[in-house]
A protein has these predicted regions:
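N-terminal secretory signal peptides that target proteins for export/translocation
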Residues: 1-6
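Bacterial N-terminal signal peptides
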Residues: 11-20
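Gly/Ser/Thr/Pro-rich low-complexity, intrinsically disordered segments
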Residues: 8, 23-253
Length: 253
């Protein structure tokens, strides 16, 4: 309920949720029963999808081993860091289950996601060395990407110029820490310019946001309950087969 009220205070109306009375409470209570909560919101002329883990024992991991829909407990799978021109290497050093793995250097890596146990944070790369040490020591996970919202401020200049120069013909997705400290993956449902996407994140109450690999690498999926059929988040393009690493929300039970 608190998330819905905060959105309404900003003039952002969740799609399919009544804006007054018991109708809003009933609709939101139904959502709260799912391990992975999905909400759709209009921000200006554009529609956004928010996917948020809803119970404390869900974990966020990154992996370079492709998790399939048949794997028990996987609720969300999306591409994470950029893949290199060789279609194998991962952009930036990263940590998988406490193991440091070297990636190629790139100036676009301005931030990182750190996940240890059920704790997730998104930080600037000025903290990278300390975060890598924490991930290795705690058996955790880390990957690097463009930090496109930092401390509630949009930083569109951190998206590669080649992406910024495109017309509004692709969708965008980001891993986010909200103002209340919760984690979310937020995706634009319709096509927009990257600055429109980042402005929308800020209006939705995002404190920190890390870009996720998109374009023809955008394929991913989610489900609200363990064992449900998957809901695809983007078309399966030819480049999907070259995805090299993934951000995964996994249930502990």
């Amino acid at each position: 309920m608190k998330r819905i009220k905060k959105l309404l205070m900003r003039g952002i109306l969740p799609m399919g949720v009544m804006a007054a009375g018991c109708g809003m409470a009933a609709a939101y209570d139904d959502v709260l029963k799912t391990p992975l909560e999905r909400n759709s919101c209009m921000v200006g002329e554009h529609q956004f999808m928010l996917l948020q883990p809803n119970v404390a024992d869900l974990v966020i991991v990154t992996t370079d081993s492709l998790p399939g829909p048949e794997e028990p407990g996987v609720l969300l799978r999306v591409a994470a860091a950029f893949t290199g021109d060789d279609l194998r290497s991962v952009c930036g050093d990263h940590v998988v289950a406490g193991e440091l793995r070297r990636g190629y250097d790139d100036v676009t890596c301005t931030g990182h996601l750190l996940a240890v146990g059920t704790r997730v944070s998104i930080r600037p790369n000025s903290d990278l060395d300390a975060s890598v040490a924490t991930a290795v020591k705690g058996g955790g996970y880390l990957f690097q990407q463009c930090l496109i919202v930092e401390d509630g401020v949009g930083r569109v200049e951190r998206i590669p110029q080649a992406i910024r120069d495109r017309e509004a013909h692709i969708i965008y997705r980001a891993a986010c820490i909200m103002n209340d400290g919760s984690f979310a993956v937020i995706q634009g449902i319709d096509k927009m310019y990257c600055h429109e996407f980042i402005d929308g994140l800020v209006k939705l109450g995002v404190q920190q946001a890390l870009y996720l690999d998109m374009g023809t690498w955008a394929y991913g999926w989610y489900r609200e309950h363990n064992g449900d059929p998957i809901v695809e988040l983007a078309p399966h393009f030819d480049n999907t087969r070259y995805q090299s690493n993934w951000l995964v929300v996994r249930s502990c039970y």
